[in-house]
Amino acid sequence: YCADLGVLIAGDMVLPRITTNVSVQAVEPDANPLRWFMDSLAVHATLPADTLVLPSHGLPFHGLRERVRYLRNHHKQRLEELVQACATPKSAADVLPLLFRRKLDERETRIAMGEALAHMHELYYDGRLRRYRDEQGVWRYTKT
């Protein structure tokens, strides 16, 4: 962020039309990237209202605070939906239809799995879900 110019080079952090891919990666299988993302959004929310945002995808835009508010609410809503869905044990694959309400191709499914895990990890580390490995070795998450 350049205060003198009122410009934020946002990269993928804040995109104008789609949500950022926040995923658990194979190199950090126990990471909590959604927490890091939400913490970063909180910082972005403090920037001036007239900030010009330069995203890595899409056109430059104004309205950073509104976009950050939307993104935070979007993820909070998804987290609440996941807690309710995990009244019975679920794997990350089980919750894909809840998080992604359209048919996903193979590539999109791989990306979506990382995002599903990021949401499950946030709830697990926040104490709202517990997890265990089932007899096939798959992590199952259930409401605490």
Residue spans for each PLM region:
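C-terminal regulatory/interaction regions
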Residues: 80-144
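Metallo-beta-lactamase
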Residues: 1-79
